[in-house]
UniProtKB/Swiss-Prot annotation:
Residues annotated with Phosphotyrosine modification: 812
EC number: 2.7.10.1
Gene this protein is translated from: FGFR
GO-annotated cellular components: plasma membrane; receptor complex
Residue intervals passing through the bilayer: 548-568
Protein name: Fibroblast growth factor receptor
Binding sites annotated in the UniProt record for ATP: 645-653, 673
Extracellular side: 44-547
């Protein structure tokens, strides 16, 4: 067997060859060999031990609770009557270390033991082992779990109320209204946000099942959620609203009666009158009853409540549809009455439909609430209900009942269930006889609560057949369930029975019932209920010599297969490295982006880079084996390098002459990228990465194109097109007019630029960027300094990746990831380090501004340290002089704060093309007015709120931006 690029070896030399060629895999092979050797040695040792007689393991271990602190363990198959054997019983408290002592029982005929002195209502793990005195190992059963009393999953207390009112300034302890065994773990949330013991607020603390307020404040009011869970059943969420009231205040606004916890014990402390009292701004006292929508039939009573408190007593004003004096237009105004914080409209008609807003205010503030009252003429028909379906659920699962009304009335729902389980199926047929007495009361007041409903039903009898189901516990991830849906969590056997849905309106009431049948799970779940406990299979060592031999052989075969697979994988990897594809395989919407070197100050990192950057030691250049690419490899003897045209800390760009790189036997002037002698591994990998990406990108007239490379038998060279006029920034600055004292002694030879020339430059850059965007490449450093101008005045986007000046600080800000071109970067790139094609559009706007100012410096008076605050406040660069409003409109669109609102490069190409088509070659610039923005730019920009600004179009706009655009064509 031979491996790629390794000397041919015999089988005995396989491991040496694999170690020399693939050192990173040697450790894994060594581990596999150790496992194989251990398996074989174990088989041999077991052959000797197998001759000894082992005890039989106890079978059918069960646990029976006899009281809260004691459990009886029973098993079968003792030690065959031998007197020299013994039994060991192990007992562990679940998840809490040792819970009971280990018991050693002499004699082999024992099949039962009572474990005492346990903690009540706690779960334990038990295991029984049998031993011979002359044998080194015993035989054991698996672990089982049991407790003295059956565990209870989290369940909501029956007497729970969802509204809690507490006094200001006192200490209060509010427990989670959940019963469970073992004691549940509780987590608290306020207004949907987690409250943790590590919060800086020392006024709030937590016990195992309660939240404690040292001194209750108004800011502590809100919606609290208690999440309780233990090892059994599903977690339960309980919501309640905490209202803080000032019992020392003489002013106490009239409101609805508040409910509270009647069964919870509260701990209070003295009120410290020396501390400053909090402001008593108005607040609503019963938000749960303030439902925003009130759909009612005509000829009914409308009751709108806005119960509130405050000091001083707040005033309340009612308005309808924004009109304060709405009562003068009411038919028979005596029907409308205000009682404190309640608005009552008797015998409502359709004209009473509207939005009623209560405005509650005092000197500290104003609050308001709006009711949407809809009065409709409807048929006088009580609710017509669809039959409910019976439900079968397994223990511990969730289920629900749905109550549907088919007519067009909006009824009031109430859910109930029967107490007890005796003959409950027959009670569904007898409910009509009992429920008819409620008809008259329901017609008078259809919005009865469920408790009020049963008070009338049983007329204060102590023994009740029905009980209410409060919907406060019916919470889901999406919010509260609808009133016509009853959802039951963590179903238990005691939940089995009939359930009733009662729906009523002003014309009567109807009901439907269904039966919940609770069954055992079809698949045995982990032990979490009362014993008999579930037996866990015994995890004993194999006692058969045949089994050990089989396991050893199987292990050896597995190791052999793994070694063979690794060898095949190594061979395939080497073949792929020897014959790489001409272009990288890019599938899916993968984005390529430009990388910025750590020490970069100029735009010197590779133009295009993959997402993961190579890192290695920064001492010397590693000897990389670069695969030969015949399509791009250029002979070194046909390349002559000349003077340096760009230089940085670790690399440089030189001018060169290549024979036959463009046409056969024709010498072409090229630019050659190379490394300096002090370059490190990172710079080497950057250069190779840029080379690979340029191969994949392809050619375009407005991109510095790759011509070839030299990667074999010497340092790597990247050969690209040469630009005669250098970068665009210096080219523009060279076209600026001379200073006054120079005009008399110098003769200007620079060609005069027109508006059309400048638009052509921007157009070509936009086409190049549109090409990159189509290839899913992100430049990240688009600026005039990174655009080259050829001898034919073509614009070519580039980046001489290894030419850098580490002392230059104007363009970049030092971060942990390197220096960044701060003044060219979009806000999302600065603040969130998010680089996309739309962030390149922002940079294009800065580049267009540079073009219109003939190489001006953006934000000349804004320090780099203030750029973050400058952009965050919405300020932008001002319009360059002699720039038309349509051009500045493009700038403003590129500088939109939201990336999604910026134009695409395809749209920019079309817009600039339209401007060029209507421009005149005679549109000369006033060269006296171009250059860097004046010093006052920053101060004037402070007064310009640019956020959301859209520059007005001049009357001479020559084009209209279409709503949709097709992709722009490219030259390959």
């Amino acid at each position: 067997m031979s491996l790629p690029r390794c000397p041919r070896t015999r089988t005995v030399m396989f491991s040496r060859t694999l170690t020399r060629c693939y050192p990173q895999r040697t450790l894994w092979i060594a581990i596999l060999c150790v496992i194989c050797s251990w398996t074989l040695s174990t088989a041999g040792a077991t052959t000797i031990r197998d001759k000894e007689v082992k005890p039989d393991a106890p079978q059918d271990l069960t646990a029976i609770p006899v009281k809260a602190e004691a459990i009886v363990l029973t098993w079968k198959k003792p030690l065959k009557g031998q007197t020299d054997g013994y039994i060991v019983v192990y007992c562990l408290k679940r998840n809490k270390g040792n819970g009971c002592e280990r018991q050693k029982i002499e004699g082999g005929n024992v099949t039962e033991v009572e474990v005492t002195n346990l903690y009540a209502n706690h779960t334990y793990q038990f295991q029984v082992q049998s031993w011979y005195s002359d044998h080194p190992k015993g035989a054991s059963t698996g672990y089982i779990e049991a407790s003295g009393t059956p565990p209870i999953p989290p369940t909501l207390r029956r007497n729970f109320k969802g509204l809690v009112e507490k006094s200001l300034g006192f200490e209060h302890k509010i427990p989670c209204p959940v019963k469970a065994d073992p004691r549940p773990y509780t987590r608290w949330l306020k207004n949907g946000t987690d409250l943790t013991p590590n919060d800086p607020d020392d006024n709030v603390s937590f016990t195992k099942t309660s939240i404690v307020f040292k001194r209750l404040r108004f800011s502590d009011a809100g919606l609290y959620t208690c999440v309780a869970s233990n090892f059994f059943g599903q977690p339960i969420h309980v919501n309640f609203t905490l209202i803080v009231v000032d019992t020392h205040s003489e002013s106490y606004a009239e409101s609805s009666v508040l409910e509270s916890f009647s069964s919870l014990e509260l701990e209070t402390g003295p009120y410290n009158e020396t501390e400053e009292e909090e402001t008593h701004f108005p607040r609503f006292t019963d938000t749960e009853r303030m439902e925003p929508e009130k759909p009612l039939p005509s000829n009914t009573k409308v009751r709108l409540e806005c119960g509130a408190r405050g000091t001083p007593t707040p005033n309340i004003t009612w308005i309808k549809d924004g009109v304060q004096k709405w009562k003068i237009n009411v038919i028979r105004p005596t029907r409308v009455e205000e009682k404190g914080f309640v608005l009552i409209i008797r015998r409502a008609i359709v004209r009473d439909t509207g939005k009623y807003t209560c405005i509650v205010s005092n000197q500290y503030g104003t609050i308001e609430h709006t009711y949407d009252v809809k009065i409709r003429e409807r048929l006088p028909v009580k609710p017509i209900m669809s039959p409910m379906k019976n439900v079968t659920a397994t223990v511990g699962s969730n289920t629900s009942f749905v109550c549907r009304v088919v007519n067009d009335l909006t009824p009031h729902f109430a859910w109930m269930r029967f107490n007890g389980t005796n003959n409950t199926k027959q009670r569904l047929t007898d409910i009509d006889d009992h429920i008819s007495i409620l008809q008259q009361r329901w017609v008078e007041e259809p919005m009865l609560t469920c408790d009020e409903f049963l008070d009338v039903f049983y007329q204060n009898q102590s023994k009740r057949m029905l009980e209410c189901l409060h919907l406060i516990q019916l919470e889901t991830q999406g919010g509260m369930e609808e009133a016509n849906q009853l959802k039951l969590y963590n179903v238990q056997y005691e939940d089995e029975g009939p359930y009733l849905c009662v729906a009523g309106n002003f014309y009567g009431m109807s009901w439907e019932g269904a039966y919940l049948d609770v069954v055992e799970p079809t698949t045995q779940a982990p032990v979490r209920t009362n014993p008999p406990a579930v037996y866990i299979p015994n995890n004993m060592q194999p006692t058969s010599k045949t089994q050990l031999i089989i396991f050893s052989v199987v292990g050896f075969v597995v190791v052999l297969i793994l070694v063979t697979c690794i060898a095949i994988l190594c061979k395939q990897t080497q073949v792929r490295h020897r014959r790489p594809s001409d272009k990288p395989d890019i599938s899916g919407p993968k984005h390529l982006y430009r990388q910025t070197s750590v020490d970069s100050t100029q735009s010197i990192a590779p133009l295009f880079g993959g997402r993961n950057r190579l890192t290695s030691s920064l001492t010397v250049i590693s000897e990389y084996d670069i695969p030969l690419d015949p399509e791009w490899e250029f002979p070194r003897d046909r390349l002559t390098v000349g003077k340096t045209i760009g230089e940085g800390a670790f690399g440089k760009v030189v001018i060169g002459e290549a024979v036959g790189i463009v046409c056969q036997e024709k010498t072409s002037t090229v630019a050659v990228k190379m490394l300096k002698a002090n370059a490190m591994d990172r710079e080497f990998s950057d250069l190779i990465s840029e080379l690979a990406m340029m191969k994949m990108i392809g050619k375009n007239p407005n991109i510095i194109n790759l011509l070839g490379c030299c990667t074999q038998e010497g340092p790597p060279y990247v050969i690209v097109e040469f630009a005669h006029h250098g970068n665009l920034r210096d080219f523009l600055r060279s076209r600026r007019p001379p200073e006054e004292y120079e005009k008399s002694i110098l003769l200007t030879t620079s060609q005069t630029l027109t508006n059309k020339d400048l638009m052509s430059m921007a157009y070509q850059v936009a086409r190049g960027m549109d090409f990159l965007a189509s290839k899913k490449c992100i430049h990240r450093d688009l600026a005039a300094r990174n655009v080259l101008v050829t001898e034919d005045f073509e614009m070519k986007i580039c980046d001489f990746g290894l030419a850098r000046d580490i002392h230059y600080i104007d363009f970049y800000r030092k971060t942990t990831d390197g220096r960044l071109p701060v003044k060219w970067m979009a806000p999302e790139a600065l603040f969130d380090r998010m680089f996309t094609t739309q962030s390149d559009v922002w940079s294009f706007g800065i580049l267009l501004w540079e073009i219109m100012t003939l190489g001006g410096t953006p934000y000349p008076s804004v320090p780099v340290e203030q750029m973050f605050d400058y952009l965050r406040s919405g300020k932008r660069l001002e319009k360059p002089q002699n720039t038309s409003l349509e051009i500045y409109h493009i700038l403003c669109e590129c500088w939109r704060t939201s990336p999604g609102q910026r134009p695409t490069f395809c749209e920019l190409v079309e817009d600039l093309d339209r401007i060029i088509s209507v421009s005149s070659n005679q549109d000369y610039l006033d060269l006296e007015a171009v250059g860097d923005a004046p010093v006052k730019t920053f101060q004037e920009s402070e007064r310009m709120a640019f956020m959301g600004f859209r520059a007005p179009l001049s009357p001479q706009v020559y084009y209209k931006v279409p709503q949709t655009r097709d992709c722009c064509p490219y030259a390959n």
